[in-house]
């Protein structure tokens, strides 16, 4: 199973909450590495420098992320009632769950990136 965490708070909200010197934001307003950990670990207070005001994090995303990682840890399959069907990844269809405020399982979502990486180190 492959996912792309694409949810990100508004940059200005993170700066307003933390101050410019303490905020960790993407200059492009995109999700950053490890941004999902507060959601996975159900710890909205865990990293406000990255996610902003914990009280403003989307509760539905906190709940669905926690439930999905729990299902995967328990069964080896992330599927549960809170998200759409998550199809497993294989080299022909390349399904990926794209996670924003909602969840979308997309086929070959990042084809250009995948082809570039495959040229360097083929998926087996």
Model-derived features: where do they sit?
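C-terminal helix-and-tail extensions that cap enzymatic domains
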Residues: 1-124
